[in-house]
Amino acid sequence: MLIAPSYLSPSSIGLFRSCPQKFKLSYIDKIKEPPSWHMHLGSFVHEVLEYLYKEDPNERTHEALKKIAADRWSNHGWAEKVEGLTEKLDTVAGFKRSAFEAMTNLWDLEDPVITNLEGQEIEVLTSIDGVAMKGYIDRIALDGDGSIVISDYKTGKVPDPKYVADDEKWFQLLAYALMLKEINKKSTSKLELLYLSKKVKHTVMVTQENLDNARKVVVRTRASIDESCKSGDFACKVTNLCNWCYYKKINICPAHSGNSDLR
């Protein structure tokens, strides 16, 4: 019998739903995917914007952004991280250019001077209907009426609705809204996904219906993970996304390696 993780996170639940075998390799077998170009790009952009929003509102300028980005790059290990990648999709200069373009696109989506943040990179640890959950919320903002808005920065593509359903797109933030309510009894009014590279903001209002649906996903996924751990059967979901999967690349996914014993 395999041992399931003690805690789940919104992202680990999302991974199990997209491919149970990938979840097993990452969270049970502990075979972690090494950092990639896209991972580093997203992390660097998140980090710089986090520090931008630590500035006093009137100091949240393009010039401040440049200084923060230069400092994080040179003095906090980012130059070494990016230069050390074995697979580079562009030059290091290209990485910096893409990152800075994504950061400056923030001004097309909101005005940092008047954006009122309640917190950033907030660790949340709670239980939803007996399912132990933990994770980190990118940021919590307060709307004009003081209501809570959970936001997430994205540096990748805007998902095509033909392939990504709304409940899948919003599940992680809805799960965080559930977790916040369990912790402090405060309700979240709205969710935001800020696609920085594309200058696109998607928003959705939080309703009791979509919260209830997210709660069901959490509980059912926990039950499915526990059952898979008992049986040892973690299905492989073979799709076009497999072409970008690290586990296929290193030949340990049973769907592509021909070794069914890896299941």
What are these regions (language model features)?
Residues 48-120:
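A non-catalytic, helix-rich entry segment at domain boundaries
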Residues 22-29, 46-47, 152-157, 192-203:
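Short acidic (Asp/Glu) and glycine-rich catalytic loops that position anionic groups and cofactors
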Residues 7, 63, 145, 166, ...:
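Metal-dependent nuclease catalytic regions and adjoining charged, substrate-binding loops involved
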Residues 20-33, 80-82, 150, 156-160, ...:
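Short amphipathic alpha-helical segments and their helix-coil junctions
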Residues 2-18, 134-146, 209-215:
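An acidic intrinsically disordered interaction segment
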Residues 13-14, 18-57, 96, 100, ...:
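Nuclease catalytic cores
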Residues 37, 41, 95, 169-172, ...:
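Hydrophobic (often cysteine-bearing) scaffold residues that line and stabilize catalytic clefts
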Residues 119-175, 180:
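Non-catalytic protein-protein interaction segments used by genome-maintenance enzymes to assemble
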